[in-house]
Amino acid sequence: TIQQERQRNGMPISNLSYHCAFIGSPGTGKTTVARILAKAYKLLGIITNGDLIEVGRSDLVSAYLGQTAIKTNELVDKSIGNVLFIDEAYSLFERKDDSYGKEAIDTLITRMENDRNNLVIILAGYEKEMTDFLSTNPGMMSRINRYIHFQPEGM
């Protein structure tokens, strides 16, 4: 990756991450752009594989107490070197007492920090829901460097 090359050449390593939020209505091209971005990041050496792994809440959250972190970590492990695209990311935290969703979010926040040199996570969803989700989650918000807004065609 770029960071590894910088390190090999004795250059300082930046704490830059490429995690981002795609915000917009259905059909505005969020998934298509994420696929293109995954390939571009591979070509740039930011990630090693360049595949887009598309997931939702059910892929990250378990039905059993204590199993969500395991499930989320296993999915992130499989996503190393790729872009992990979490559609309707706000659904991870549906209610204030949603301990399963909170466990998934806490696990993702840790992995976004620890694996940022070979993993890109894109959180996607509708504008109002994503704004609410990110504003109640300072840890998640601090790891997102780019907010890309997708407008319906003709707007």
Q: What residues fall within each predicted segment?
A:
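Substrate-engagement module of ASCE P-loop NTPases
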Residues: V76-K78, A104-L119
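A short helix-turn-beta junction within AAA+ P-loop NTPase domains corresponding to the substrate/partner-engaging
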Residues: S135-P152
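Pre-Walker A adenine-sensing motif
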Residues: I2-I13
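Walker A/P-loop
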Residues: P12-G50, E74-K78, I144
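Short glycine-rich substrate-engagement loop in P-loop NTPases that contacts/grips substrate
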Residues: T48-S79
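Structural recognition of the conserved hydrophobic beta-strand(s) that form the central parallel beta-sheet
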Residues: F85-D87, D106-T107, L119-Y126
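Flexible beta-alpha connector loops of hexameric P-loop NTPases
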Residues: R57-T68, S91-K102, I148-H149
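Conserved nucleotide-binding/hydrolysis micro-motifs of P-loop NTPases
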Residues: D59-V61, Y90-L92, Y126-T131, P152-M155
